[in-house]
Design a protein with these regions (language model features):
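Internal acidic/polar
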Residues: 10, 91, 99-128
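Conserved RNAP core-binding helix
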Residues: 31, 39, 50-67
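Helix-turn-helix DNA-binding motif, specifically the short coil turn and the N-cap/start of the second
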Residues: 49, 155, 164-169
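A short, charge-rich alpha-helical start-of-domain segment used by transcription regulators
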Residues: 17-40
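A short pre-motif secondary-structure segment
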Residues: 145-149
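Structural recognition of an alpha-helix C-terminal capping motif at a helix-to-coil junction
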Residues: 55-62, 75-87
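Arg/Lys-rich amphipathic alpha helix in sigma70-family domain 2
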Residues: 70, 83-103
Length: 187
């Protein structure tokens, strides 16, 4: 069966999930749709090099495929796959017995700087190396919400769904993440 990649833009995630359950070839459309954003999320969350990030992404897509039948269509599909991606990435980091490697794309730092009032206040003290160190010195719980909100541009509800935390907790964690980032930068 030939699948037209152009169909990818026309079909909703839920339609593609349903079609993938009936014909595994349609999973290619789902994986094509989410490959770039998930790869970027894994890299931002973990700090792994490109090759290791690709490996984690492949494992994530296998998990998504194997668990596709357990997806609840009442939930947002992107939240569901980001949750799987998040859990698997954190599990991989624990297996490696390491904290994330200090990798952040300089463009991400510019994006954070331009979207954070806290960072705008300390913009003159912020250079790229300092920002990398500051972000990776945060506890995982703060770094996770910061990456999802600022770099992945997720709404609070979607972050809550991905992290399986109440929306109030997400808001508190994000607020604390920016405060801690500010404290580190000011030092």
């Amino acid at each position: 069966m030939h699948i037209d990649i152009k169909d990818n833009k026309k079909l909703s995630d839920k339609d593609l999930v349903k079609m993938s359950l009936e014909n595994k070839d349609y999973f290619l459309l789902l994986s094509t749709r989410y490959e770039t954003p998930l790869l970027r999320y894994i890299k931002r969350l973990s700090g792994l090099n490109h090759e290791d990030t690709q490996d984690v992404l492949q494992e994530v897509f296998i998990k998504i495929y194997l668990n596709l039948s357990s997806y609840n269509p009442k939930l947002k599909f992107s939240s569901w796959i980001y949750r799987i991606t998040h859990n698997h990435t954190m599990s991989e980091l624990r297996k490696r017995h390491s904290r994330p490697i200090n990798y952040i794309d300089p463009q991400d730092l510019v994006f954070i700087k331009s979207n954070s009032d806290v960072l705008k206040e300390t913009d003159n003290k912020l250079d790229l190396e300092q920002a990398k160190k500051a972000i990776y010195s945060l506890k995982d719980k703060y770094k996770e919400v910061l990456v999802l909100r600022v770099l992945e541009e997720k709404e609070y509800q979607e972050i809550a769904d991905i992290l399986k935390k109440p929306i109030g907790t997400v808001s508190t964690l994000l607020n604390r993440a920016f405060k801690k980032l500010n404290e580190i930068i000011i030092k």
